[in-house]
Amino acid sequence: MQLGHIFTPKHQKLVNQCYPSGRAPDKKPKSSETSYLIYYVNSRSSKLEKVSNYLIKRTNTDLSRRRVGNVCVTLELMAKIVDHCKENLNVFVKEFLTLMNMVLTNNSINNDVTVIELLEITFGTICRNLDGAYYGGDTEFIKMFKSFVDLLFEVVSKRLNNDDLMLKVCIDISTIIGIASDPQLNYLVPKCVETAIDQLQARYPQFKENSLLEQPSLTKRLSKTQTRAQEVLEIPTADNDLCVATLHNYFNTTETDKLNLSIRSLIKKLQSTPNKELLEFISNDIPVQLRYIVVLLLTRQVSNYERNQVSGSQGNPDGALNSLKLISCLLVSKISIVGLSVLDIMRKVLAVQLKSKESMPLVHQCRVTIKDLNNKIYYSEQTSDMLYDLVVKIKNVQNEVEKRILVDDMKYIVDDISQPVINVDLLTELVPFMKGSVIQLLNITEEHISGGSTLSRLFQMVRDIEDRNLQSKAMSIIFDKYKKIILLPGLNYFQMNIKEPEYTYYLYHFNAAKTLGVTSYYSETQQKLDNGELFTKEELMKYYKNANNTQFGEKGMQILMSYDNQISNSDLLNDRPLSPVFSSKPLSSPMGLISPQAQTNTQLNQPMRFVSDDVHSWKVSRPSIPKVSDLKKAMKNGSSTKNKPLRGSQSVKSRVTNITFLLSELRSTTAGDDSHIIDPDEEEVVGIDKMEIARSLSGRGRNSVVVEDVSTNRASFVPATVNEDDEFRDAVEDVEAYSTSRGKIFANY
């Protein structure tokens, strides 16, 4: 006996030393020997496989001899080895699964709760240390694992009928990293979730009832997106209940694959037993940033029904109806949701609604769900975007039935709004489809005005209303809401657009009189209404002159005095004084009594003129070289027959050369006729570029003087008087160019 003990391998000795003597069923491994065994296998990883194989051999012997205590010690040793040697789990995990499978299949011991509980602890230790890298490509391990888990579920549920132990197994499976991403093992996730929900409904009957009732309309808006958990249905024993803990492990996770599978299992359960309390309770456990997935998957259930309708297959209207009700229940609950794509969900619900227009319950529930989407504000322009989207869809729909459905959807949303959330542009888009709800639309319109053109559309909207009572209420609301900015643009609008008496014109003046605080203005408006007359500008100027508000009075006077009211509404929306507006008609000034030629001479005789003063500048008019015929006519008639002045574009020296050549040719044709050729410098300069003036100022020649212009405080160029006795010199001689301006224009002689 001693000789056999001497030749026993060390790893077997260390394992055997961990087992206490005796046949007691509640044995525990020896602590010191177990610690040394753990140290041994941890420092010599090559011994792990030998230890695991020996444990299988020893367990097989213990099972055959019904040594329950030794089996319990083996299971505890396995749990400790897994926990301390998890880095090398792939070395021995298959042997451990084989060992546990031997225990489960032994009918003489698999009905012992103590043994199965220890086995569950060992299984949980393995699950917590499993990773996709261990089993991703190992088909043998996956097959063994699936077989073991299925057998474990069967033993616990059928032989032991232990619900808590079953829930513990579900919790163990939830700790496996990446199990939802593996196509061969992800079936375990919905199986565990359904098991936990069944247990929750069995223990708490309120989660099993059909409680889908239409929610009352909420006119009070919640604050912007909340991020803290709200109070939902409380369960007193939730913290200590394994079914609640199991659901927490599957739903309170950031693994989207696992969460997706878990929510699908929840929706499947809710289709058979619709219960909004169950939906709210579980949704509250989902991380707030991922709760929108519940709404998306419920919406997908509704879209599947719409696709079935399109393909011709029989859909389930009750399933779509329940899904819509569940969405509404979640949207109006106190559960916080962030990141919800409101427009995308609304468009999908609208598609189902229009495809199912024959089913009135489904159409109505779609409308309720769309309205509930706007129950919480996820971003500032949410309501406006929803209404704009409906307006665009209404304009594109040709079917009248579908158009009426969309208009009713729009009314349903508007009826649920209690705060100003739409702008004036959207208001003018909505009114043509909701003529009976003009007052309500005005009440939910923001006070901010984007621009002057918006006000014109606002007045036009009031003019398009057929009911006079509605017109009167609408105009009063407009003045109450935009009192500070509507008065002057309104005066400008009605002066420009109203040529014949109409009721809206008098409504404006009634409210304008109240705003200005002029009683006589109000009574005069009533007389004009009775007589069917319009105000003259002089009458309105009198009232604005006597206005209590001087700012309104001054701007109103300027509007009335301007020609054809050529003032932008944008200028009327600010507090700056208006810029003067000039009439396009000629002014009746003293210049108007002077003939055009005299006006031209007066302008030419001004001490300083720039290019902008005369359209015949040398830079903007094409230069014309004088011809011999022009000179002949000038000699005969004393003036040019053409109104266009003779100009030259050459330099001074080349210009003198050209003129000398022309003179010689002229003498040859008119022998003996002494003609007096006028020096170009005798005429006044018609236009000089500003840059040329600057050059002339920098190099003052003897032919120019500088005069200080008192009115403009700038140096003006005045050409010097040229002696009429000056004669041209031949081009062969050197010519000194004293003038620095190259663009003088010759006036007609």
From Swiss-Prot:
- Quick one: a GO cellular component term? plasma membrane
Q: What is an example of a Pfam family matching this protein?
A: EFR3
What biological-process terms (Gene Ontology) are attached?
Answer: protein localization to plasma membrane
Q: Which residues form the signal peptide?
A: none
Residue ranges, annotated region (Disordered): 633-652
Origin: domain of life:
Eukaryota
Polar residues bias: start-end ranges: 637-652
InterPro entries, A to Z: EFR3 (IPR039786), EFR3_HEAT-like_rpt (IPR049150)
Family per record: Belongs to the EFR3 family.
Designated name of the protein: Protein EFR3
The upper taxonomy is:
Eukaryota, Fungi, Dikarya, Ascomycota, Saccharomycotina
Gene name of the record: EFR3
